[in-house]
Each structure stands twice: as C-alpha cells, then as structure tokens.
C-alpha cells in the first residue's frame, strides 16, 4: 500500500509585502489568504494520507484571524498534519504554534527531534522545528 503525502512550505502568511505598494500588495495579500483553503481542497482532491508543512508558514508577526483560518483548513483536511516551524515562525512562547489552539489532527514539532507513530498508515513521522540546534 502506498502513502500519499502532501508537502508544502514557505507560505509566509501575513507577510507585509513591504516592497510592493497599493494594488499589487493588496492582490498578493488576498491571494496568500487563499493558500490554507487551497491546501484543504488539494488534500481532498488528491486523497492524501497526511500533510507535511515544513517551515515558514507564517512570515513572523501574525494575526489571530489568519491563525484561525489556517487551523480550520487543517482540521478540515481530515488527515494527520505535521508542522515543523521555520526561522520565520520558530517554535517559542510567542509563536502561533504555542499561543494558538490547533486541531487534534495537527502535530507541531518543537525544537527537539521527535517522532509520531501512525499505525493506521504503518509509518513513523520524524521532525524538529527551527531551533533544534540551540
């Protein structure tokens, strides 16, 4: 039996797009807010078994609205989701990964290497968030 994994990274949600002005900035920000829903839709369309998000999902400072949008989309994926925070959204006390409530199907790796067994998929997922070398 094969395993279908959806992998993505570097969304940089809530990026200020500081090098753009006016309409281009607005367009990019609106397009960026559609990414979580597009991930959910792609997960369903492709019948994925799990999702791996490998860092910099947020650009840095984030809005709670965006975090809620992401949490809802990830929950609606209906499969295990694994997040390894990156250098822009590192795992720490002020990060969205610690401050916000995430659905039960979402596992967020901290700065230490760890793993999660998924017996129903006959696999083990290893991960670590940014800061693992600290």
PLM region descriptions:
Residues 1-6:
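Extreme N-terminal starter segment of soluble prokaryotic enzymes
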Residues 8, 54, 84, 126-128:
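Short hydrophobic segments within beta-strands
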Residues 9-14:
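Short polar catalytic/cofactor-binding loops
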Residues 15-19:
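N-terminal donor/sugar-recognition subdomains of glycan-related enzymes
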Residues 21-116:
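Core catalytic region of metal-dependent phosphoesterases/phosphodiesterases
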Residues 119-134:
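Binuclear metal-dependent hydrolase catalytic cores centered on His/Asp/Glu-rich metal-binding motifs
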């Amino acid at each position: 039996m094969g395993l279908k994994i959806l992998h993505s990274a570097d969304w940089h949600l809530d990026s200020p797009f500081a090098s753009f002005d006016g309409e281009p900035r607005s367009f990019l920000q609106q397009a960026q807010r559609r990414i979580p829903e597009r991930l959910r839709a792609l997960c369903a369309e492709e019948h994925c078994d799990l999702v791996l998000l490998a860092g910099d999902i947020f650009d840095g400072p984030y809005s709670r609205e965006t975090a809620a949008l992401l949490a809802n989309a990830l929950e609606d994926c209906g499969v295990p989701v694994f997040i390894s925070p990156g250098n822009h959204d590192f795992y720490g006390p002020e990060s969205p990964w610690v401050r916000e409530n995430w659905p039960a199907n979402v596992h967020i790796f901290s700065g230490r290497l760890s793993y999660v067994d998924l017996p129903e998929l006959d696999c083990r997922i290893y991960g670590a968030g940014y800061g693992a070398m600290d």
